[in-house]
């Protein structure tokens, strides 16, 4: 079973990849094709939001296990 720290590391790596994907779309499609960019950016943006929530939850879980 993976530790919360290992899962958080993986989540952060996935966030970085999604940000790179979004940046590549931006470089490829903007400013020339803003509508196409908006459509294609939806999925990476949703995934980024999901991963951010996951990272917040994992961070809270890690902090909760640290003795005061």
Predicted regions and their residues:
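Short, charge/polar-rich alpha-helical segments
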Residues: 1-16
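Residues on one face of amphipathic alpha-helical coiled coils
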Residues: 10, 17-20, 24, 50, ...
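Short, charge-rich amphipathic interface segments used for partner binding and complex assembly
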Residues: 34-64
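Short E/K-rich amphipathic alpha-helical oligomerization segments
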Residues: 16-41
């Amino acid at each position: 079973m993976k530790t919360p720290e290992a899962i958080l590391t993986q989540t952060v790596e996935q966030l970085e990849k999604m940000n790179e994907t979004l940046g590549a779309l931006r470089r490829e499609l903007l400013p020339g094709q803003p509508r196409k960019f908006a459509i294609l950016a939806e999925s990476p943006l949703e995934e980024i939001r999901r991963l951010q929530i996951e990272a917040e939850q994992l961070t809270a879980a890690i902090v909760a296990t640290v003795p005061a």
